[in-house]
Structure formats: structure tokens, C-alpha cells
Amino acid sequence: MKVPFLQLLCLNAALASANVVKGAAQGFAAGVTGGGDITPSYPKTNEELVSLLESDEPQVVVLTKTFEFIGTEGTTTENGCAPWGTGKSCQLAINSNGWCGKNPVVTITYDNAAKNGIHIKSNKTLVGEGDKGVLSGKGLYFEGGVSNIIVQNIKITNLNPGFVWGGDAFTFFGADLIWIDHCETSLTGRQHYVTGFHPNTRMTWSNNFLNGVTTHSAGCDDHHYWTMELVGPGDQITFQNNYVYHTTGRGPALSGTTLFHAVNSVWSSIPGHAIEGGDKGRGLFEGCFFEDVVEIAPAKPENQLFSASEANAASCKSALGRACQANSYSKSGAFGSSETGFFKDFAGLTIAPAGSATDALAYVPKNCGIGRL
């Protein structure tokens, strides 16, 4: 029996951690409770917000305004570089860890706050009220084994968009049981989502808007390149009902040994490529829609990819316990990868339900991101 797309989104809704959270995580992060039933806190200042998120106690934190971090930690002026020229729409780069190499040297000035995210600790719920919950000039950082965290209905923006290495929206460096839902990321210096060199397990990223429209880019236009760099060993990510828009690369880069289950997500307006990475990255894509994507993935990708079609959908049963939903395409390149050798790695994980790709196209772009719960 075919389950309607909207009904899929309502499954397990009774498991929400507190009344400020809408719905419940599906996929790998199923069961996450965040701060639980703790009485919500409504911070008024940056200092109050940081203190709550970095505390060792469970917290439910509700954002009711824009928290402006730009200028709060000063600026740095130093030598950087111009890998793509100095045109008004070209990104320059911070010389992080000697990244600039032999590229032309230029003097740059960037805001310090965006380079250092808030180090959110375990058992937290962070939720925005309506469309008001915005972090401007500061991202979130999950490290050191933190677990059981919900972030829902917020926007992270203005992270030194003119500079590569200027700031990441969501950084994961050893985390478990994390649900990122209905969030928008935009105007980042580097990645919208990045996983580091420690395992990041049981994560669900759902209903998010990865907005690639930017002021400066590696292509010297308004398409952001640095989208999702996933390099953790053994990352486990359900990528459900997300909208990747107006980017040109790394969407995602499966560069570590990430297990990436993309379900009912939409990629649109991508003049470059979407998927890349190394030979150990693993990605299953089903019920997804690719619209105006010049190159979805290389014809012979290094990584292990499975793109669901009507012809191969039944082969998913060994991994997911059900057949896959076929992907769909409009004005996009081919995506014929059918590697199944990694399907055994789904054992023991909670699998998100899937609807059709055409239903995803109709629903996801209009309902993802902040203010659309």
C-alpha cells in the first residue's frame, strides 16, 4: 500500500521532546529527546544564549529574535589569498593551516566571531519561534562526544561569506544522536554542514534549506560552492526532505567513510556538480529529485553510490527492509550508480520512510527551512 507523502512526515510525531518541538526525528536519529521536558528558557542576550547551550545541564532554549554576533569578537587583518581573482564577486581565502599555498597574496579583514561556533553540549533542544530565531555571524559546533541534541526552526547566516574558511554553519566533530530540522543556512564562508575527523553517528538532517545564493563565491558568481564536506570516519546521516539550492559543488562531498541516506530531498539550480568524494564514502539516494543539476555525480565516481530507479528499487530490501523509491530528474545529468556492496552497513539503524520523488519536488521547496513548521 502506498503511504501518502504528508502521512510519512507525521509518523512518530508523538515522540517530540517538549511542546516547543514539532514532530519527531525519523531515520538514524529516531528517539532523540534533546532537553526533554525541561521548562524552556528564552535568552535575551548573546551571553545568555551561549551560557545555556554550553552548560552541562539539559536545556530547552527558544530563540525569539536575531542574535547578532558580528563585531562582538573583533576582526582580524592579515595576509590571505585570491585563488579565483579579486573580482567583486570572487571569494578570497583565509590562510587557514597554510591552505593558500602559492596563490596570490592579498590583505584581508574578516570577522572573528564566525570562525568560532557555539560549542553546544549534550541534552539540548534549540528551537526558533516562528521565523524569528536567527544566529547571525555565529554557527554551532558539536564535538567531544556530545549527544542527544535537537536544533529546529532556526537560521544561521552571515559567516564571512567573502572568505573561504570564514565560517561553517553546522560543524560535527564527534557527536551522536543529533537532529537538525527545519533550519536554513545561508551566506557561509565555507560549509553549510561539515563533519570532522571523529565519528558522527545517528544523525538526521531533515526539512532544511541549504540556500546557496551568496554574495561571493569560488566561481565569482552568486552560486556557493562549499556545501557539505563529510569527512568523519563512520558518519551516519539520514538526509531527509532537504532542499539544496543554487550551489555548485560538495553537495555532498562524501570524503570520509560516511554512510549517507538521502531520501525525498531536492537538488535544484546547480550549474556545477552535486555529489563527490573519496572511495570509502557511501551514499544511497532514493525518492530524490534533481532539477537543473548539470552533473549530479561523476560517471565513474570514486565513492560507493546507489541511485534508485524503477529497475533496481527492489534491491534495497536487503538494506532498508523495503524497496527504494526511484529518483526523478528534470534538465539534469545522468545518475546511474548502482553499488550495493555497502548495503550491509544499514544493519541495526532506523530507516526513514520514503515517498515519491515527484511528491518531494512538490512539497519540500515550499515547506523546508525556518518558519515552515
UniProtKB/Swiss-Prot annotation:
Cysteines paired by S-S bonds: 81-100, 90-220, 316-324
Recorded catalytic activity of this chain's protein: Eliminative cleavage of (1->4)-alpha-D-galacturonan methyl ester to give oligosaccharides with 4-deoxy-6-O-methyl-alpha-D-galact-4-enuronosyl groups at their non-reducing ends
Cited Gene3D superfamilies: Single-stranded right-handed beta-helix, Pectin lyase-like
Top EC class of this enzyme: lyase
An example Gene Ontology CC term for this record: extracellular region
Signal peptide interval: 1-18
Glycosylation sites: 123
Keywords (A to Z) from UniProt: Carbohydrate metabolism, Cell wall biogenesis/degradation, Disulfide bond, Glycoprotein, Lyase, Polysaccharide degradation, Secreted, Signal
Record protein name field: Probable pectin lyase C
Annotated compartments: Secreted
Family per record: Belongs to the polysaccharide lyase 1 family.
PANTHER family in the cross-refs: PECTATE LYASE 18-RELATED, PECTIN LYASE A-RELATED
List of catalytic residues: 250
Lineage: Eukaryota, Fungi, Dikarya, Ascomycota, Pezizomycotina
Function description: Pectinolytic enzymes consist of four classes of enzymes: pectin lyase, polygalacturonase, pectin methylesterase and rhamnogalacturonase. Among pectinolytic enzymes, pectin lyase is the most important in depolymerization of pectin, since it cleaves internal glycosidic bonds of highly methylated pectins.
GO biological process: cell wall organization; pectin catabolic process
The organism's place on the tree of life at top rank: Eukaryota
Major location (coarse): secreted
EC number(s) given by UniProt: 4.2.2.10
GO MF term list: pectate lyase activity; pectin lyase activity
